[in-house]
From Swiss-Prot:
GO terms for cellular component: cytoplasm; synapse. Residues 191-203 are annotated as: Interaction with Slo. One of its GO terms (molecular function) is protein kinase activity. This is Slowpoke-binding protein. The gene is Slob. Residues 7-20, 73-82 have a biased composition (Polar residues).
Amino acid sequence: MFKFNKAAQQQRIDNRNSAVTGHDPFVRPPVPEKKVRNIMKKLHKANGLKRSNSAIEFDVSALTAANRRQIYSSNRSASSEQDNSDLSEHSEKSPLVSARLDNLARLFFSKSMPAETGSRDTIDSVLTTRPNIKYQYSALDSGNGIVERSPRERAQREKALNATQEWIQGANGRYEVIAHLDEIGSRHGKNWFLVTDASVRTDRLQTLLPLPPDCVAFEDLPPNECAREILMELLGSLHHPYIYPVLDLGFLRNSSYNYACLVTPFNSRGSLKDLIYKAQWNEPWARKYTRKPNGLPVSQVQRLGRQILEALLFLKERGFPLHGHLHSGNVILQNGAARLSGLENGLLGLSSRINAVMWSRSVTEIENVDIVCFGHLLYEMCTGQELTTPKPSMRVLEMELQHYPQIGQTRKQILEILGLIFEPPSGVCPSVEDLVLCDLFRSIDLRELRGPCFSTIKPSLSRSTLNLLQAVKKRQCASLGHSLSEANSPCTPPSTPHDRRTGVLPAPYEVFRMY
């Protein structure tokens, strides 16, 4: 029996060895059934159904391509789909071509309707046909996509657009109007346009200003002098990191209107007032400044305040007359720096519509106007609010600044500067140099003044330009004397954007705004 079992075992070994040929890797011995079940279970577990990917695990490029296809397909109008039904296969293969054709059709359609230049559809078509624009622009309307305007306002805007087109034609087609913007400022009759400078292929901001009948550039200059050349010589000589430049200037004078056209760089960051109110630069003035303002951090107040003082100091060294229009709306923020704008207002003889100094009865020196305006601006940067009186008392300022904890340990330094401006110990208003040497601004590092582009060489101006500066100074002194002669009349604070919109008369001693 033992020999029989041993012989059977030997037979099974011989049969197993005959099933393989040496070390052939393609033929393997049979695997036990239990081991086979374990292997199959592991394979099913490894290659089974996986969970769906979350949004963060999706391929970004695939999502972008899908979104583009969806946008292109939704932008196509119903008429174009019916007319081009036989080209649907080609459109699916090349959606970029069909989208560009639709955008060109929109652009041509918007240009054929000049009265609707400021509408939402026109602005949207501009954005889609200009993919290289690095900023986001959209007209914020009242909900239905159409800005409601009275017939008189529409007629004024159409008149301003026609005047701008006339000036552009006189400039040999250098500029092209992209959009007629809303009233982003408070000056009555002023219009803003987004234009393209064809010479450098760059977008610019063009403003159309109504000139007063007694404009300095035409009243105090000889008839044989060209006002445009003189003003461009003066404005072109003001090269400074904290001065917002005027790139081009022109005049339109005829029997129906009297305008000045100015071209400045386009800046999507807006003004200092836009930063305080956290508003978009292109929102209407009557809407964006009705929100709750916020004070700026102390470090930002120090840096921006020092930059504004450096701009005023530069104008003083160049013999430029006082600014007279210094407020947060005329401080443009560009690359983190404050740049003073609105220099052309004083040269053209434009009066400041709402100027806190003109409501004061104690400012008798013309040089102190910008200093007092800077005090109002400093308070607005720290608190976000505007002063309710032209020259507040220090006791009121101390009580007000206690409600703003973000000022911190610099409250004493801020009160020191405000005290020098509104209640000077010696009765003499401080100069710009005195404010620069205060502890709040003295240690601020100005990297823009270290660059090689900044030059301290004072350019020589022509005799005609110097005569214009003297005429502007005399006109400003005369206007200040006229405002002081009317000091016996009660001061009526100007209206806020909300009051202008609703027609409600402001209450006495209400907070007024400087624009």
